[in-house]
């Protein structure tokens, strides 16, 4: 959530910044107008409460002196009614103000490419050239089906579209990938966490998914009243429970930065994705992802973003997967992010790079919503900065391995770093499936 004081005192700057993220200036004008009325009413209410205290003392004095206090009592009643009306007005204005604030995205960083969509994204660097073959490479969904290690048909029968069974060596490969990711992340200084996979609304609001993105997730409902949500949502990413671990808490400065990592399932409705990536592992309703989260001091967050991005890159490099790093434009970056780097891995059958990680600096945006603060050496409280990044999306990593390491005979060579995690298996063949 943005700081209303920053918007109030820098209105033109705020309009210019948020215009690059699709926010109309009229929304900020309305917000500032509500804020001014709220502060005016709040000040008047506080003044009247002070007056009421004075009148109360006068009444007590008159009663002690056995004087008539009826006029003062009547005056206090009138003041009390006015205070009640003002406080009600302040509460309503506060609700309106928060309604707008909770739906405004983060301010983009000055270095972000400016543009309305991903066509304005800028390549920052590239690692290795795209994989070349002496034959026409197959798509990972065909490779997985032909090898008998991925089964979409039975998953569709059981769960519907955008689900998959991993079979035999497919399941082993998925497990090898996420165990490798977790091991490497812990070597890089992250503490592993196993978080809850169901979270409450306050947690979803803390990381910015609610109230704006309800349609993108799966929420649990009450069996006795299907129209009534239970205040529990299946997590769309481990970022939610990892960041909210620190919600409403004060961290001592000497504990920062904090680095945590977690494997979790991710559940997404993929609303608005009809017709996109209908085959394969790229866009699923349920998938596994290893997440990395950092909590740090404001003056450290930009350096921590670079470290976070390099941690994610390190995983792709050890797997030998070609990729490039892209700085997202103001119109393509996520709601909570001030700056985002996407890591896009090369997919030979699609002849293009596809996102496998997003590494974002959310500055104090999530910390303000979730009240994540730290106490400095002088005892003063400050909002922390939060960062998050995929390290990495497991299913997409499996897809990239199948496509980049495929052989002409239909087999897939296992990347060297994964062989120990695959019980020594160096090649996945048709005999690797189960059914």
UniProtKB/Swiss-Prot annotation:
One Gene Ontology MF term: catalytic activity, acting on a protein
Gene: serS
Naturally occurring in which organism (per UniProt): Lactobacillus helveticus (strain DPC 4571)
Function: Catalyzes the attachment of serine to tRNA(Ser). Is also able to aminoacylate tRNA(Sec) with serine, to form the misacylated tRNA L-seryl-tRNA(Sec), which will be further converted into selenocysteinyl-tRNA(Sec).
Organism classification: Bacteria, Bacillati, Bacillota, Bacilli, Lactobacillales
Protein's recorded name: Serine--tRNA ligase
Biochemical pathway: Aminoacyl-tRNA biosynthesis; selenocysteinyl-tRNA(Sec) biosynthesis; L-seryl-tRNA(Sec) from L-serine and tRNA(Sec): step 1/1
Notes concerning its domains: Consists of two distinct domains, a catalytic core and a N-terminal extension that is involved in tRNA binding.
Record GO biological process: selenocysteine biosynthetic process; seryl-tRNA aminoacylation
Amino-acid positions noted as binding ATP in the UniProt annotation, renumbered to this chain: 268-270, 355-358
GO cellular component: cytoplasm
Broad class of the protein's primary localization: cytoplasm
Taxonomy, superkingdom: Bacteria
Entry EC number(s): 6.1.1.11
Subunit structure: Homodimer. The tRNA molecule binds across the dimer.
Cross-referenced Pfam families: Seryl_tRNA_N, tRNA-synt_2b
Keywords: Aminoacyl-tRNA synthetase, ATP-binding, Cytoplasm, Ligase, Nucleotide-binding, Protein biosynthesis
Binding-site residues for L-serine, renumbered to this chain: 237-239, 291, 390
Reaction(s) this enzyme catalyzes, per UniProt: tRNA(Ser) + L-serine + ATP = L-seryl-tRNA(Ser) + AMP + diphosphate + H(+); tRNA(Sec) + L-serine + ATP = L-seryl-tRNA(Sec) + AMP + diphosphate + H(+)
């Amino acid at each position: 959530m943005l700081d209303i004081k920053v918007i109030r005192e820098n209105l033109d700057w705020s309009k210019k910044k948020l215009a690059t993220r699709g926010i109309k200036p009229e929304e900020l004008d309305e917000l500032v107008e509500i804020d001014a009325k709220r502060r005016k009413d709040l000040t008047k209410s506080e003044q009247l409460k002070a007056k009421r205290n004075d009148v109360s003392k006068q009444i007590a004095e008159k009663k002690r002196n056995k004087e008539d206090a009826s006029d003062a009592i009547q005056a206090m009643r009138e003041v009390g009614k006015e205070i009640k009306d003002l406080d009600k007005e302040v509460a309503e204005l506060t609700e309106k103000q928060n309604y707008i604030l909770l739906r405004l995205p983060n301010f983009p960083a000055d270095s972000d490419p400016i543009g309305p969509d991903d066509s304005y994204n800028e390549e920052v660097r590239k690692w290795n050239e795209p994989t070349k073959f002496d034959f026409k490479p197959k798509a990972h969904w065909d490779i997985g089906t032909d090898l008998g290690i991925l089964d979409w048909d039975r998953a569709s029968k059981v769960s519907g579209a955008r689900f998959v069974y991993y079979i035999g060596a497919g399941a082993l490969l998925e497990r090898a990938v996420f165990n490798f990711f977790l091991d490497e992340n812990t070597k890089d200084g992250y503490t592993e966490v196993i978080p809850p996979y169901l979270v409450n609304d306050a947690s979803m609001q803390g990381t910015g998914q609610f109230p704006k993105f309800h349609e993108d997730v799966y929420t649990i409902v009450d069996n006795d009243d299907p129209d009534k949500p239970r205040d529990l949502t299946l997590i769309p990413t481990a970022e939610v429970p990892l960041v909210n671990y620190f919600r409403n808490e004060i961290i001592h400065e000497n504990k920062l930065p904090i680095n945590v990592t977690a494997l979790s399932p991710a559940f997404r409705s993929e609303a608005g994705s009809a017709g996109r990536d209908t085959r394969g592992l790229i866009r699923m309703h349920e998938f596994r992802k290893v997440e990395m989260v950092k909590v740090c001091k404001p003056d450290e967050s930009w350096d921590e973003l670079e470290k976070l991005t390099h941690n994610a890159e390190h995983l792709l490099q050890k797997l030998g997967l070609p990729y490039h790093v892209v700085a997202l434009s103001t119109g393509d970056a996520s709601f909570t992010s001030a700056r985002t780097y996407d890591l896009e891995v090369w997919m030979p059958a699609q002849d293009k790079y596809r996102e496998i990680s997003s590494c974002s600096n959310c500055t104090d945006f999530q910390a303000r919503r979730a009240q994540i603060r730290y106490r400095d050496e002088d005892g003063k409280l400050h909002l922390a900065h939060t960062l998050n990044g995929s390290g990495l999306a497991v299913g997409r990593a499996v897809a990239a391995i199948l496509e980049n390491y495929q052989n002409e005979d239909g087999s897939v060579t296992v990347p060297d770093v994964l062989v120990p995690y695959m019980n020594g298996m160096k090649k996945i063949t048709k005999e690797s499936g189960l059914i």
